Amino acid sequence: MRRQEAGTSSLATRVGPEVLTTAAVASVTGCDDPLAAVLLGRPKVIEVLQRSAELIDRVPALAAAHHQIADYHAMRSRFFDAYLADAAAEGIRQCVVLAAGLDTRAFRLPWPDGMTVFEIDQPTVLRYKENALTAHGARPAADWHPVGVESDMPWPRRLWESGFNHNEPTIWLAEGLLPLPDATQDALISEIDGLSAAGSRIAFDDVLGMCSGRSDAPGWLTSRGWWTDVVEARHLPELSGRRDDDAQSYTAHAALVTAEKIA
């Protein structure tokens, strides 16, 4: 099931797109995340990357677009890294990563003592990641709970069964998951809202101004007691301390949204 098709009962993703996102971040950052190198070095991943590289190399315009997308993904990743680390430093002790894929934040971020990280995705994706990292000897920096969810399972129930406490503030991350079809997106955000105690936070990327009448996720949150901030992605190079505009065309309609539940 593709991210764009993820329903409210399933936050399933495929290994393929997550491999490409991980590769994109690694390529732009000089692979300074050793865990990304671990995940990219396994045979089935190398096969995916080789097929993708062959397709990209055939079309110069596609190669240029790939570089822009990779650049954006790397900047987006660093933005969310900082947001999650700051929220944890301010006292939140549980984080839920939706459609986690090959995300390694449970292992590589400087989580404080007592931090719990839940990762929701297809069981096959989470098993692949766990096996690769375990074989490498990597250890999570938090109390890590991979939450495997099949397509016919309600993900909130699986989250509760894994030890999630909805009475405590939560940091939610939905990186690369939105936008979704209107009804699906509204239902997903409503479920997150219902599971969030006051003081909870959420971070996600969205596409703004592309489709008139499309469900407005930041507006939905604001109307339900969340303080919302929107950073247009075209400002990411500046926020990253860079002056180039390589990612400008790709980020023209992208935005990074963060919000805190006030009531």
From Swiss-Prot:
- Name the record gives this protein: Putative S-adenosyl-L-methionine-dependent methyltransferase Mkms_0098
Q: What class of enzyme is it?
A: transferase
- In this entry, which stretches build a coiled coil? none
Q: Which UniProt keywords apply?
A: Methyltransferase, S-adenosyl-L-methionine, Transferase
Q: Could you say which EC number(s) this protein's record lists?
A: 2.1.1.-
Domain of life according to the entry = Bacteria
- Please provide, alphabetically and separated by semicolons, the GO molecular function terms listed in this UniProt record: methyltransferase activity
A GO BP annotation:
methylation
**Which InterPro entries does its entry note?**
Ppm1/Ppm2/Tcmp (IPR007213), SAM-dependent_MTases_sf (IPR029063), SAM_mthyl_Trfase_ML2640-like (IPR011610)
Query: Which residues of this UniProt protein bind S-adenosyl-L-methionine?
Result: D121, E150, S151
Stated family: Belongs to the UPF0677 family.
Q: What does this protein do?
A: Exhibits S-adenosyl-L-methionine-dependent methyltransferase activity.
Gene3D superfamilies, per the entry: Vaccinia Virus protein VP39
